[in-house]
């Protein structure tokens, strides 16, 4: 799998921004078929930072109502990437 298709987008929630400020962790949405090792290699190669650890969260689909019908959202996968001490990622600093 191509490293640019592994990482989809960063997650900008209040909890994710608090993790970034307090514990030097970045939350990103990743492809559903990847594992921790692939996420770590892709993140280090794309953003040129050292990664300490990666945690993976599988997000279950939620039931949403559309008019009279009920549908499900797609299942997704999030990764919490812990950067090594002294490393900074300037991509999310301005948010």
From Swiss-Prot:
Pfam families: Ribosomal_L23
Gene3D superfamilies: 3.30.70.330
Superkingdom of origin organism: Bacteria
Record has rRNA-binding as a keyword: yes
GO MF assignments: rRNA binding; structural constituent of ribosome
GO cellular component: cytosolic large ribosomal subunit
Keywords: Ribonucleoprotein, Ribosomal protein, RNA-binding, rRNA-binding
GO BP terms, alphabetized: translation
Function noted in UniProt: One of the early assembly proteins it binds 23S rRNA. One of the proteins that surrounds the polypeptide exit tunnel on the outside of the ribosome. Forms the main docking site for trigger factor binding to the ribosome.
Family of this protein: Belongs to the universal ribosomal protein uL23 family.
Subunit structure: Part of the 50S ribosomal subunit. Contacts protein L29, and trigger factor when it is bound to the ribosome.
Name assigned to this protein: Large ribosomal subunit protein uL23
Source species of the chain: Thermodesulfovibrio yellowstonii (strain ATCC 51303 / DSM 11347 / YP87)
Gene name per UniProt: rplW
């Amino acid at each position: 799998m191509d490293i640019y298709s592994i990482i989809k987008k960063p997650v900008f929630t209040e909890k994710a921004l608090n993790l970034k400020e307090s514990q030097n962790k970045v939350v990103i949405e990743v492809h559903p078929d990847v594992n921790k090792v692939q996420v770590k290699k892709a993140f280090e190669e794309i953003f040129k930072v050292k990664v300490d650890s990666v945690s993976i969260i599988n997000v279950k689909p939620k039931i949403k109502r559309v008019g009279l019908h009920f549908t499900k959202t797609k299942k997704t996968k999030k990764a919490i990437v812990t950067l090594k001490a002294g490393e900074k990622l300037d991509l999310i600093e301005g948010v």
